[in-house]
Swiss-Prot record:
GO terms for cellular component: cytosol. Pfam families: DUF179. It comes from the Bacteria. It comes from Pseudomonas aeruginosa (strain UCBPP-PA14). HAMAP family: UPF0301. Belongs to the UPF0301 (AlgH) family. This is UPF0301 protein PA14_05290. Gene3D superfamilies: VC0467-like (3.40.1740.10). InterPro entries: AlgH-like. PANTHER family: UNCHARACTERIZED PROTEIN YQGE, UPF0301 PROTEIN YQGE.
């Protein structure tokens, strides 16, 4: 019997099924930054925190007044792990003190990317979040087996160009799925 190699979902969206009971992930779409035999890491991309970049910058540099445009740049709840730590998804090409290249996207975790965005010299498109979603080895696979998530390849247009409230339905639509037509009951055939 041929052993199949595991399928990893790096650069995919996780779309929460309607029966998702965990309040951290109910009605969310999560971008998977990493997924391998050691586990997975992702950022929820459709949960604005109520904070904006100006408020974050005021905490980082209380003596400096952030540009007015920073009041219109939302900060997202990226997940329940390390909620005091910032993560910035952006198109690859620009590098900061701490940038992880992810192919066509990159993730920066150093403060310099925030100041560059504020100054207008940072990435044109970005998604800034506090916290991340993490899964231990085998945990995400078990959740997928339990039908907790749908998956599809990530689309930068959904990440960066759509309002937060449209991202979940747009990600599901990539699969031809209307989430409002799915039952809130999970099962196996």
């Amino acid at each position: 019997m041929k052993q199949s190699s595991p399928t990893y979902l790096k650069h995919h969206f996780l779309i929460a099924m309607p029966h998702m009971a965990d309040p951290n992930f109910a009605q969310t779409v999560t971008y998977l930054v990493e997924h391998n035999e050691q586990g997975a890491m992702g950022l929820v991309i459709n949960r604005p925190s109520g904070l904006n970049l100006a408020e974050v910058l005021e905490q980082l540099k209380p003596d400096a007044l952030p540009p007015a445009r920073c009041q219109h740049i939302d900060i997202y709840n990226g997940g329940p792990v390390q909620t005091d730590r910032g993560f910035v998804l952006h198109p690859s090409g620009l590098s900061y003190q701490s940038t992880l290249e992810l192919g066509e996207l990159a993730m920066s975790t150093s403060q310099d990317v925030l100041f560059a965005i504020a100054a207008g010299t940072g990435p044109e498109k970005s998604l800034i979040s506090l916290g991340y979603a993490g899964w231990e080895a085998g945990q995400l696979e078990a959740e997928l087996s339990d039908n907790a998530w749908l998956t599809c390849p990530a689309d930068p247009a959904i990440l960066f160009d759509l309002p937060a409230e449209e991202r979940l339905s747009a990600a599901a639509a990539r699969l031809g799925v209307n989430l409002s037509l799915l039952t809130a009951q999970a099962g196996h055939a």
